[in-house]
Amino acid sequence: NPLDGSEMVWVPAGEFLRGRENGYRDETPARKIHVGGFWISKTPVTVEQYRKFLKATGREDKIKIPGWPYQVCPPVQEEGTYPALGSWYDARAYCAWAGGSLPTEAQWEKAARGTDGRLYPWGSEWDVEKVARRTWDKYVLALGMHPVGTAPDGTSPYGALDMAGNVWEWVADWYAPNYYADAPAKNPEGPE
């Protein structure tokens, strides 16, 4: 992407197994879902990329969530290769500026898991050595993050990185506790 320098990976159209049988209530049931083909960023947005967005748009570097009286994260001052932190509104604005959109939860889950029913990008067994794990480096102690793309053993079947661990990632749709059970079987876009 010429605006932010991000590399994208292609996730082809098709079915995948969404959810799980023995998970939290809002992750069940496991169902086959069809998702159209889409591009997704190979890594989470970095601080360096987010700074380009702030400069180009004149937005403040403080995370503000409408109706939330607290500052949830510090201003953008961390090292450029760490993941950027922001509100859902910031993430949506960033994606629009970069010429894309936030993925739906179904798109994100397919990009992370692939089509063979695995639970994690690397397979179905939890492996702390493959997760984009938290570090305790003095520089990022308070945030507990690591630079993006530094856990290649956790690469998804489509080549996306850091889709298990490090930071939570925003998706386009809103949350509903029964949505995995109630969602349409083709291109679910989230609850109303």
Regions found by a protein language model. Name each.
Residues N1-I63, W88-Y89, D116, G123-E125:
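Short, compositionally biased
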Residues V11, L17, E21-N22, E60, ...:
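Functional-site microenvironments in short loops/helix caps that host divalent-cation chemistry
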